[in-house]
Each structure stands twice: as structure tokens, then as C-alpha cells.
Amino acid sequence: MSGTKKVGSAGRFGARYGLKIRRRVAAVEAKMRQKHTCPVCGRKAVKRISTGIWQCQKCGATFAGGAYLPVTPAGKAVRRITE
């Protein structure tokens, strides 16, 4: 695993690109890699398959979402309007 305890996955960049950007990348990737809630079964078992494609490990539901998170702010607003 590349990186260190302090910077996580952004350690692969070394001293390049600046601290602020590397911290931002590490934060986004940490959120992306955690388990998310499935919109079908409600379990915390959703993982990213590819860019914008998410799949529940429990029920097998596959759906499109954001590039780094399964639910985007725009998607939340649309869902709120339609319900």
C-alpha cells in the first residue's frame, strides 16, 4: 500500500502538487473507499465498481451515482423534489 499513516493514499504523490491538494485528494479517496448505504436494501455494503458505478455487495443492486460518492448533492435535490 502506498502512502503513510499521515497522508494516506495521497502519499503516492510524494512532495509534488502541494500539501493542500494532497490533503484534499486523501479526504475524497477516504470517503470514496468507505462502505455506503444501499438505496435498495438499506445495508452499508455499497462499493465503487468504476467511475460513477456503484454496487451493493449484499443484494447485488448496481446503480449510477457520483464519481466519488454514490449520492451527489444534485441527486439529493432531485430526489427530494420527486418525492
UniProtKB/Swiss-Prot annotation:
Annotated GO MF terms: large ribosomal subunit rRNA binding; structural constituent of ribosome; zinc ion binding
GO biological process: translation
Keyword presence, Repeat: no
Gene Ontology cellular component terms for the protein in this record: ribonucleoprotein complex; ribosome
Cofactor binding mode and count: Binds 1 zinc ion per subunit.
Alphabetical keyword list: Metal-binding, Ribonucleoprotein, Ribosomal protein, RNA-binding, rRNA-binding, Zinc, Zinc-finger
SUPFAM superfamilies noted in UniProt: Zn-binding ribosomal proteins (SSF57829)
Superkingdom of source: Archaea
Pfam families named among the record's database cross-references: Ribosomal_L37ae
Cofactor: Zn(2+)
Subunit (UniProt): Part of the 50S ribosomal subunit.
Protein name: Large ribosomal subunit protein eL43
